Amino acid sequence: MTKGILGKKVGMTQIFTESGEFIPVTVIEATPNVVLQVKTVETDGYEAIQVGFDDKREVLSNKPAKGHVAKANTAPKRFIREFKNIEGLEVGAEITVDIFAAGDVVDVTGTSKGKGFQGVIKRHGQSRGPMAHGSRYHRRPGSMGPVAPNRVFKNKHLAGRMGGNRVTIQNLEIVQVIPEKNVILIKGNVPGAKKSLITIKSAVKAAK
């Protein structure tokens, strides 16, 4: 069965194992998520649970949003997402970090840091041209393709806006879970800036 929770990225640190191994970890704070709705095939056409995370002031919510969360007897939520293939939860139930344990393999989704308008070298990793005095080609995008089509093909690597995309990193290991602090430590780095929304789910390609 799939397990999932929403959290916020706190930052990175490092821990040492009992054997002295150094492990860089990302700290994710995941306060209890609340099940706001249970979707079924009969009513919605598919099965899923809708989860809310991070309370916000009622003055910032409209009447439909307040009525929606009232069914779960909770405060309005800043982030609402869905998880599929999760069973046994009812409206109003809480999902806490202790659904995961050290050693679990998960997929982590976040929004990558926005870098603004960047050239092809930074954005796509292209090599620059010669920097010699006689060269007139340094950081340009290169050939636009053959003459015959009379156009530039789609997906040509060009300068443009970089970052700010939804990114999923698969098969990351959970190093430690601290239930009393609502914290999960994940090995390595995860996409996103500090305080950004992070989705943690059971890995779909984990070795069985």
From Swiss-Prot:
Q: What does this chain do?
A: One of the primary rRNA binding proteins, it binds directly near the 3'-end of the 23S rRNA, where it nucleates assembly of the 50S subunit.
Chain intervals for the UniProt region annotation (Disordered): 117-147
**Biological process according to GO:** translation
Task: Tell me the superkingdom of the source.
Answer: Bacteria
Q: Which InterPro entries match?
A: Ribosomal_uL3 (IPR000597), Ribosomal_uL3_bac/org-type (IPR019927), Ribosomal_uL3_CS (IPR019926), Transl_B-barrel_sf (IPR009000)
**Similarity annotation:** Belongs to the universal ribosomal protein uL3 family.
| Intrachain disulfide bonds | none
Keywords tagged on the record: Ribonucleoprotein, Ribosomal protein, RNA-binding, rRNA-binding
Q: Know the name of this protein?
A: Large ribosomal subunit protein uL3
Q: Which GO terms describe its molecular function?
A: rRNA binding; structural constituent of ribosome
One CC-aspect GO term? cytosolic large ribosomal subunit
NCBIfam families assigned: L3_bact
Q: Which Pfam families match?
A: Ribosomal_L3
Q: How does it assemble?
A: Part of the 50S ribosomal subunit. Forms a cluster with proteins L14 and L19.
